[in-house]
A protein has these predicted regions:
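Serine/threonine-rich, low-complexity intrinsically disordered segments
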Residues: 13, 36, 63-64
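A short, Lys/Arg-enriched interface patch at domain edges and termini
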Residues: 50-65
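Polyanion-binding surface elements
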Residues: 1-28, 58
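Major-groove DNA-recognition helix of helix-turn-helix-type DNA-binding domains
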Residues: 18-46
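Hydrophobic aliphatic residue packing
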Residues: 11-12, 21, 41, 45, ...
Length: 65
């Protein structure tokens, strides 16, 4: 997984492309607080690749249970 995620903060478009989902899904996750933790830089939404990795691993674990 570390080879897949870039070393920079991700935009919502980056996250959507990485996960293969529409950008609107990323925004819905944010509104519902079900997606990876994001933060604002001024008006811009960003995601830390480490938080995204942790969220993906959590989703994989939830899917198993």
């Amino acid at each position: 997984m570390s080879d897949v995620l870039p070393a920079r903060f991700l935009t919502p478009v980056d996250l959507a492309e990485l996960l293969g989902v529409p950008v609107e899904t990323v925004y819905q996750w944010r509104r519902k607080r079900t997606g990876p933790r994001g933060f604002r830089v001024g008006r811009h939404l960003r995601y830390d690749p480490q938080d995204v990795r942790a969220w993906i691993e959590q989703q994989m674990t939830v899917g198993i249970a």
